[in-house]
């Protein structure tokens, strides 16, 4: 009961301004219960209504020394500020202080220190309390009605349950952020909708097809073939196709055909809420991962990608593994995946019996010997996942040999160097999916039509990657 109200009512009784029966109704007490505070008022006055524990520190209260250590530790993070839950984990790991996130949050808020993940409403409330120097939360006297909270039907994106099986739906996205150092890099991610596990992660300078191929390779190697993938429509998968008619520039077709050969249903969406799992994962990692990278002194893309391999396992143990039911299918072997995760380009053989790709010339080879095709023979160039170049001519795949600008040695003035024995390369079978006819059928089905480029039609002096 409010001490002030009780004091004013009892005071009115003592002064003869109010009857005991009226006081019983106002304070919801019996007449006997009214007599006790009335007697105390006559003996002690207003002090009789002061609670005995006021200004007394509880036995379970956190010592001021611990609070100072917590504040000093949080303020020591200069580049990246952790959210409160992550900070509690760091406190337990580095300082041996084990407190709940609610307790730590109250300590920080009392000093007007806000978490980087605080909501706008919380920031406004804390600032208002600091300005008015109040210890109790402020109440808004104007109460809204339920109608004021109804959402516009066009903006409604209701929550949905997770999928039942792991591998039933994979959400993919790239998150640009200053993950380490001042420069912005892109973290490409794939998360399983059912289990909440990160299935693949890869850093690159930009959002690239190569990075998504690395993520897909991690999924295939560690888990298998999923049923469906959902990606952002405004990403590397679509924006290049509108600016170029070159096949190799259409990342969506390249990635889509790889998924088509694996039997993965690829879906794109422009609505962030439609792939909320990966969007929330981006926010979580933007808060946590930069601190872990800084703690481990990670400064390069190579170091960051190596660190991700162990970090994903730790992250999944803490936040994932929500289901063990799986519908992942067995993935192709590494040699087959190397060709499935490839870049494609249409070329024709020129009068020098070679094709030109990315400002370099290549001649098809078979069992180490050069194979010469007639001029204008159509070829499908395959830049494999490991960077090797293959040619598909009449549905037969050939290895290639790069045509150098100058000879490596002079037969007239130098001794011929010893020839290193080449390792036996994987030769795809005739049933391999990268067939020109099947690829053209896929293009036709997706209403794609690309012009063919001869080697003489490419004159850019810069190497395209």
UniProtKB/Swiss-Prot annotation:
GO MF annotation terms: DNA binding
Top-rank taxon, per record: Bacteria
Domain Integrase catalytic: 157-340
Single GO biological process annotation from the record: DNA integration
Pfam families for this protein: HTH_29
PROSITE patterns documented for this protein: INTEGRASE
Keyword annotations from UniProtKB, A to Z: DNA recombination, DNA-binding, Transposable element, Transposition
InterPro entries per record: Homeodomain-like_sf (IPR009057), Integrase_cat-core (IPR001584), ISNCY_transpos (IPR047797), RNaseH-like_sf (IPR012337), RNaseH_sf (IPR036397)
Misc: Found only in encapsulated strains, not involved in capsule production.
Role summary: Required for the transposition of the insertion element.
Protein name: Transposase for insertion sequence IS1202
Taxonomic placement: Bacteria, Bacillati, Bacillota, Bacilli, Lactobacillales
